[in-house]
């Protein structure tokens, strides 16, 4: 769904007494997401609103998060992630690269996913640096976004989102003091989804390696997130990814768009 209409559809559905599952980023801009939250709160309805950051529900991410919470790789230090695709002919004419409809380019598109994942592993970011650039596509929005995000405790996320990644790529690496977790692939055109665990020994040197393969023919993250949404309704529990997450995500994106740096 084009970003420009997400907040309007959400409010319309809530006023009609419906629970809402809204695609990320939930609104076209930071101002729109702030206004949406205010309006939702004023409705005072006991309705669920879940935001569709489906990458949280990939089995490799679920497994990695569980391992981090169990302190298997020790205290986290930093994250490094690359996410990109090669687009298609005349991609610059599509709505995703029309700022009026999308709100931005690759940062708000694929970039929002790896920002979201970085948040759930490292926490909130207090320092943001970014470089946004259109290298290839003739568009007024960026086709590449480079971000360095830092938490209050100086944990760092290095993120690169691109639609000039000629071979589709998803890589998400989590570095801890006892080891490293690496998620590679999402299935389909992004290659088989795998989770690598590099366990460091006390003497360092070559780590032990364990690999989990997730070879489902379909992307089950969509099914997982909808099942999670339905469960939150049936059990009347808090949604796992709500408007607060969309707000924090868009706050970072807004900061980047306000302070664009050219290469």
What name fits each language-model region?
Residues 1-38:
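Beta-loop-alpha module in the N-terminal Rossmann-like domain of NAD(P)-dependent dehydrogenases
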Residues 16-18, 43-48, 155:
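A short helix->loop->beta-strand "cap" motif at the edges of active sites that frequently abuts
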Residues 17, 93-101, 204-212:
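Short glycine/proline- and charge-enriched loop/turn segments
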Residues 22-23, 49-51, 183:
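Hydrophobic residues in well-ordered beta-strands that form the structural core
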Residues 23, 100-108, 211-216:
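A short acidic, glycine-rich active-site loop
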Residues 34, 42, 70, 152, ...:
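C-terminal helix-rich "cap/oligomerization" subdomain common to oxidoreductases
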Residues 47, 55-138:
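Predominantly a Rossmann-like dinucleotide-binding segment in NAD(P)-dependent oxidoreductases
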Residues 116-189, 221-238, 254:
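Contiguous beta-strand/loop segments that form the cofactor/metal-binding neighborhood of enzyme cores
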């Amino acid at each position: 769904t084009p970003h420009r209409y997400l907040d309007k559809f959400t409010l319309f559905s809530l006023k009609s007494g419906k629970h809402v599952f809204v695609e990320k980023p939930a609104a076209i801009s930071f101002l729109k997401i702030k206004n949406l939250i205010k309006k939702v709160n004023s409705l005072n309805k006991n309705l669920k609103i879940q935001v569709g950051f489906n990458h949280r529900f990939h089995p490799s991410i679920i497994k990695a998060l569980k391992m981090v919470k169990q302190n298997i790789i020790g205290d986290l230090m930093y994250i490094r992630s690359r996410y990109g695709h090669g687009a298609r002919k005349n991609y610059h004419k599509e709505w995703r690269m029309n700022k009026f409809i999308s709100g931005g380019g690759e940062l708000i598109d694929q970039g929002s996913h790896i920002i979201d994942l970085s948040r759930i592993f490292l926490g909130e970011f207090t320092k943001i640096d970014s470089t946004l650039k259109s290298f290839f596509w003739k568009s007024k929005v960026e086709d590449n976004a480079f971000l360095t995000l830092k938490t209050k405790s100086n944990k760092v996320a290095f993120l690169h989102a691109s639609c000039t990644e000629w071979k589709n790529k998803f890589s998400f690496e989590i570095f801890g003091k006892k080891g490293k977790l690496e998620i590679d692939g999402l299935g389909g055109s992004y290659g088989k989804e795998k989770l690598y665990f590099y366990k460091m020994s006390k003497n360092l040197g070559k780590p032990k390696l364990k690999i989990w393969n997730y070879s489902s023919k379909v992307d089950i993250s969509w099914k997982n997130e909808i099942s999670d949404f339905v469960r939150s309704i049936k059990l009347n529990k808090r949604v796992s990814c709500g408007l607060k997450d969309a707000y924090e995500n868009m706050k970072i994106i807004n900061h980047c768009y306000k302070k664009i740096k050219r290469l």
